[in-house]
């Protein structure tokens, strides 16, 4: 097989730098202006941490942050559990009656517009409230259910791709030695797909934290998430507190992302060492 020649051109570096600049320059400007002492977000008036203090004293903003983080963590956890079960059914159970319909229902939220999803869930909750009296009020619970609905699809796709790459001979060898399918899953399969589960959890957490459209449909008067509060604030003018909040979120995402990358890299190295040790043994 002939390998195609690698074209080394300085333009590749230029294009790469332009791409990174386009992606990260706005974030850098946001971080810089979060330390601006002026009330006008576009006018520089000197360095100050004033808006971080104002942010911490803003009860409405802190309440929205707490609500969004709680919903995102709970939705990501539920989506990780349901997505793992769905992925195992899709990959390990093979063809069964209704498998195509099951796969379609799992992946449908990936291509469904948020407006349609939000409106359909709103109609569902209203119909349930009239039929059985639940939910009596729309709020944190309805937002959580809505987020689990679409986050599960993303988690299932991530874990399914990982399951298809696994060497099934390891699982078959364990069952030949007398292990039950349930024990094989928890002792062998689950540790091997754990990096994918963590990735799916982080993806679901990000999607839930970032959602505005669906939450706007299914939320109630007493439940205002962070994207909803930020959107309403921006419509009346950009508040410098938003720059400070965005900077804190960027820092938190960077730290969590690094920790997740480190844990997954260490788990992957350990998995490779275990496989090599088993083959030598």
From Swiss-Prot:
Belongs to the binding-protein-dependent transport system permease family. CysTW subfamily. Part of the ABC transporter complex PotFGHI involved in putrescine uptake. Responsible for the translocation of the substrate across the membrane. Imports putrescine for maintenance of the optimal concentration of polyamines necessary for cell growth in the presence of glucose. PANTHER family: PUTRESCINE TRANSPORT SYSTEM PERMEASE PROTEIN POTI (PTHR43848:SF2). Residues 34-68, 136-140, 207-243 are periplasmic. Residues 65-260 form the ABC transmembrane type-1 domain. The complex is composed of two ATP-binding proteins (PotG), two transmembrane proteins (PotH and PotI) and a solute-binding protein (PotF). Transport is feedback inhibited by intracellular polyamines. The gene is potI. It is a multi-pass membrane protein. It comes from Escherichia coli (strain K12). One of its GO terms (cellular component) is ATP-binding cassette (ABC) transporter complex, substrate-binding subunit-containing. Keywords: Cell inner membrane, Cell membrane, Membrane, Transmembrane, Transmembrane helix, Transport. It is found in: Cell inner membrane. The lineage of its organism: Bacteria, Pseudomonadati, Pseudomonadota, Gammaproteobacteria, Enterobacterales. Residues 1-13, 89-115, 161-186, 264-281 are cytoplasmic. Gene3D superfamilies: MetI-like. GO terms for biological process: putrescine transport; transmembrane transport. This is Putrescine transport system permease protein PotI. InterPro entries: Bact_Polyamine_Transport (IPR051789), MetI-like (IPR000515), MetI-like_sf (IPR035906). The chain crosses the membrane at residues 14-33, 69-88, 116-135, 141-160, 187-206, 244-263.
